[in-house]
C-alpha cells in the first residue's frame, strides 16, 4: 500500500522533466497529462522554438508552400508546462536528480524522460562541410537559411 501512496503523491506533486522538446517529447508530455499527472512538468529543448513538424521543412517549406513558422505541431491538449527552450541540457546528475543546462542553471526532477531524437550525420570532411553552399536540413533555422539561399539564385 505504501507504493500506491508514493505513486499517487508523484502523480499529484511530482516533478517530471522531459529533455527533448520535439514530437516525441511533446506527445509524451501530453500523455502524462492525459493519464492524470498533475505535478510540475518541465520541457527542455535546445532549439528556441516550440515543437514543430520536421518533414515539411524539406518539402513544403523549400517549395514556398508553407512558411517555416506554420510547421508548429498541433497540441492534443494544454500542457501546463514550464518551457525551457533555446537552452541545451548538458549534464545529468542522477544521484541529485538534476539536469544541468547550458546557461548554468539546473532543473531538479523526480522522474526524467529523455526524448532528444537524432541529429544529421556530420559531413565526413570538416573543410568541405564549411564550404559555402553546403547545407544540413534538420531545423527550422536550417530551412530558413536554405530558403534564403535558394531565393538569392545562383552565384
Q: Where are the regions a protein language model picked out?
A:
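Beta1-alpha1 glycine-rich phosphate/pyrophosphate-binding loop at the start
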Residues: 5-83
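FAD-binding core/adjacent interface of flavoenzyme oxidoreductases
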Residues: 1-13, 79-155
Amino acid at each position: 500500500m505504501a507504493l500506491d501512496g508514493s505513486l499517487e503523491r508523484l502523480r499529484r506533486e511530482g516533478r517530471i522533466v522531459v529533455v527533448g522538446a520535439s514530437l516525441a517529447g511533446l506527445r509524451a508530455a501530453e500523455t502524462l497529462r492525459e493519464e492524470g499527472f498533475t505535478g510540475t512538468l518541465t520541457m527542455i529543448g535546445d532549439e528556441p522554438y516550440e515543437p514543430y513538424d520536421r518533414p515539411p521543412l524539406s518539402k513544403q517549406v523549400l517549395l514556398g508552400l508553407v512558411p517555416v513558422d506554420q510547421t508548429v505541431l498541433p497540441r492534443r491538449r494544454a500542457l501546463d508546462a514550464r518551457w525551457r527552450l533555446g537552452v541545451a541540457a548538458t549534464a545529468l546528475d542522477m544521484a541529485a536528480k538534476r539536469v544541468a543546462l547550458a546557461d548554468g542553471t539546473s532543473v531538479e526532477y523526480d522522474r526524467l524522460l529523455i526524448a532528444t531524437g537524432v541529429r544529421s550525420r556530420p559531413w565526413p570532411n570538416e573543410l568541405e562541410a564549411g564550404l559555402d553552399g553546403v547545407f544540413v536540413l534538420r531545423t527550422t533555422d536550417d530551412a530558413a537559411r536554405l530558403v534564403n539561399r535558394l531565393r538569392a539564385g545562383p552565384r
